[in-house]
Amino acid sequence: AGTGDYSEEDADDTEDISGKYLCPGFIDGHIHIESSMLLPAEFARAALPHGTTAVVADPHEIANVCGSRGIEFMLEASEGLPLTMYFMIPSCVPSTEFDEAGACLEAEDIRPFYDHPRVLGLGEVMSYHAAAAGDRKLREKIDDAEKRGLAVNGHAPLLSGRMLDRYIAAGVGDDHECSSAEEAMERIRKGQRVMIRQGTAARNLKELLPLFEEPFAGRCLLV
């Protein structure tokens, strides 16, 4: 796509958009489709009219109930939709070692999913104490993602100081749990990206408005 003089011979396909507006679609960088209580196709139908053309989903809710079969279902059910659905593979199933879940996914269970073209990395590392402590099983999951050059999402509300240093050093590249500008700025200064969340359960946009100024803006995403 471009502006200027082009000939139809240069294009595989052309469309006359005279009198229309053209703008890029929104990409939601962190979402749990299951929380909407909709199947992927119905979620796409609801989100597209509002300008969202792609999402990066973490299916840890269905994975905590159905295990690998739940992840497989989400990948299959999102195939060929007009809204592109990328996925992060859940890192914490169960969410914590104290939980009783419908499944337990180890590194060898999630490793095959990294070969899928719409899988972008490892989902939010909620067990931040395990990450900071160098837990062997979690370390193996993070290493698998890093070896493939894939992203590792974070989830560490109110974590600060040396504990945050250890969490970031474990390989966690971002966080969407910041509820104050000070909390978010510490993460950015220490190398993470911050997802500014304005969702159904948590609305942090107002508190994080200072991040829209340089030098912080380039390290932020809206989700």
Residue ranges and their predicted role:
Residues 104-124, 130-196, 200-222:
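Histidine/acidic residue-rich metal-binding segments in metalloenzymes
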